[in-house]
Amino acid sequence: MKLIVTVVGKDRVGIIAAVTNILADNNVNILSINQNILDGFFNMILFAEASESKIRLVDLQQKLREQGEAIGVEIKTQHQDIFDVMHKI
């Protein structure tokens, strides 16, 4: 299962580490990361492969959402198929 993780919020040290540690702990492989900072706001989109992971998508979404709340950013996780349909022109 391929996933898209988006992160948005005020920039601070450790955002990427906070997100990627959860993914690594749950055997989710990162395929690509794009991030930037604009006017002090952090934006990241991460593409990942979760076929080797045992965690259910809903549980991973909750862990990442809770981590986002703890560090002051919004983290959304979607199956890539859903993301693709929502962003198709």
Predicted segments with their positions:
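A conserved regulatory-domain signal marking ACT and ACT-like small-molecule sensing domains
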Residues: M1-I89
